[in-house]
């Protein structure tokens, strides 16, 4: 019966629709007692073939588990948090954790603060990725868009994490924050760059990437590009003059420093397309 309900009309469905259908089938066939149901789900994830399947794209096997927790576990905080701690090491709990942030903000943030020191990089990454205000594929965390201070407190604990996997998530979270609070992002960038390791400098530059594209003054200043440049642009060359689909264009020019001192310069091209 479980297989029948899981696979009914399965193949035309999208990835998330398939996972949601399996999650509904789990709810229909697992015990009604949530803690007992979670124990069974976790037991199924611990068998050897499930651990092997969690490698690579096989981790999506556990997407229905996460949906089940998000939809039915909000009234069972401790059991659900323990389950997400274990399952996120097989498939990310960045989506399922968000309803708990909204329903139980203080308790969830306190648990996430503990997890910043967890031995598993998957758990530490969850702290950052799950609190992103604008996480792709997920509903926005509006409270964190208005006031990202609770998120920044967590990111402070992760900014020197030994795993690039975690640091990249920290940078992406800051990039999200900067879309709503550009001045705050610039302030964090300047502070983090003080006596920064190469790894932390990478976080800052990656976090500022969208702000730099928008030419935001605070972001440019944080990276040393704030002053008005004294430059002359000469010998501009664009070849060919006409371009066919699939072709390439070469752009060349010379930049001359017309001032008395050395300066840091960021050059960017603006391309306009005929519509």
Go through the PLM ranges and name each one.
Residues 1-219, 250, 261-266:
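Surface-facing alpha-helical segments and adjacent helix-coil boundary elements at the starts of domains
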Residues 212, 216, 254, 272-274:
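Hydrophobic alpha-helix feature that most strongly marks membrane-spanning transmembrane helices
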Residues 218-233:
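Proline/serine/threonine-rich low-complexity linkers at boundaries of modular beta-sandwich domains
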Residues 237, 248, 260:
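Long, positively charged binding patches that form subdomain-scale interaction surfaces
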Residues 237-243:
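Short beta-strand segments of immunoglobulin-like
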Residues 245-257:
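Short beta-strand elements of extracellular/lumenal beta-sandwich folds
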